[in-house]
Amino acid sequence: MNPDIDDTTAALRALRSQSRLDKATAGAWKRGLDWLLSMQNDDGGWPAFEKNTDSPLISSLPIEGADTVSTDPSSADLTGRTLEFLGRYAGYKENDAPVQKAVRWLLARQEIDGSWYGRWGIAYLYGTWAALTGLMAVGVSPAHPAVQKAVDWLTRQQNADGGWGESCHSDEQKMYAPLGASTPSQTAWALDALIAVHPRPTPAIERGIDYLSRQSQAADWTTAYPTGGGRPGGTYFAYHSYRWIWPLLALSHYQSKYASAS
């Protein structure tokens, strides 16, 4: 029954242009933005549905999966995607107080190998994409050591065919597990993250673009593999639109960024 952080930013993206033209939409935009900012957890990150619910007492209850079904802590994916919205659509930058808190939270939660764990997608590719695109949108330097470490990690995970693919076992083991094949959505996430960081196309980016271009008509198991997260080790989602939406977004960002730079 609760409103959703991710759906709210999606709605606000859709309302942005119209909000500049009429008062009613402008009012809806402001209410949505105010609510979004009010939902920032005290630790600086954003949850999915509920604010400040990450109590160690709840996660210690003798209920299977209590840590994932009974709490809604800040996550790298929600925090990164909220930052990406605030930076690209709401004019927020690195020196704004909510952004400063969120950036500090993200940098403190980066894994040793350079990745971030994503709660609502599979898993380290998803979290790293969200974190990097969010950091770039609010003005963090591409040369920042944490950014470069994440880029190195992403590049190392690229498959021989130019794509990326991660197993759902990552979500359960809390450790990156290669799928052994590439998926459209995970390739798009990794590619979009690299595009956000690099001012010009790199060999890894070009190989990723080639993979997405070749796989647009594919219809094998990789296009239906679940890349949405539910309950680690128990529930995963294969969103049918993911194979189209995320590649289209990554390809459009590639076109808009590098075509204008050439």
Predicted stretch roles:
Residues 1-262:
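Preference for long, amphipathic alpha-helical scaffolds in soluble/luminal domains
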